[in-house]
Amino acid sequence: MGQLSVLGFIALGGAFGACSRYLISELCVMLLGRGFPYGTLTVNVVGSFIMGLLIAAFETELMVTDPWRQIIGLGFLGALTTFSTFSMDNVLLMQQGAFFKMGLNVLLNVVLSISAAWIGFQLLMRS
């Protein structure tokens, strides 16, 4: 497969991931308000869960073709999850003096995202 094909697969997944991140973030704002970065937390936890499933699928040979790795792993999940927005959310909380919310955001993103990845991985590895 040529480099152009690889880039095309990544771009396709990235387009869906970016649109999904926007829609999930907007839904979180509608449902929960703007007082906490729920959207960023949600996309990071969901993306980590899907990545756990994806890695287990590759290890168990359920889905090992390169196009799927590129579409889902690099493209979709790369665009869905966001470390830069997570970082900026924390800078803004710090500027507002909302240190408790900032600490909670860091803790929740790290603990829930790692837990979600582990749960996703375990779900497929045990089946």
UniProtKB/Swiss-Prot annotation:
GO terms for molecular function: fluoride channel activity; metal ion binding. InterPro entries: FluC (IPR003691). Na(+) binds at G78, T81. One of its GO terms (biological process) is cellular detoxification of fluoride. It is found in: Cell inner membrane. Na(+) is not transported, but it plays an essential structural role and its presence is essential for fluoride channel function. Its main location: membrane. It catalyses: fluoride(in) = fluoride(out). One of its GO terms (cellular component) is plasma membrane. It comes from the Bacteria. The chain crosses the membrane at residues 4-24, 38-58, 71-91, 104-124. Keywords: Cell inner membrane, Cell membrane, Ion channel, Ion transport, Membrane, Metal-binding, Sodium, Transmembrane, Transmembrane helix, Transport. It is a multi-pass membrane protein. Fluoride-specific ion channel. Important for reducing fluoride concentration in the cell, thus reducing its toxicity. Belongs to the fluoride channel Fluc/FEX (TC 1.A.43) family. This is Fluoride-specific ion channel FluC. The gene is fluC.
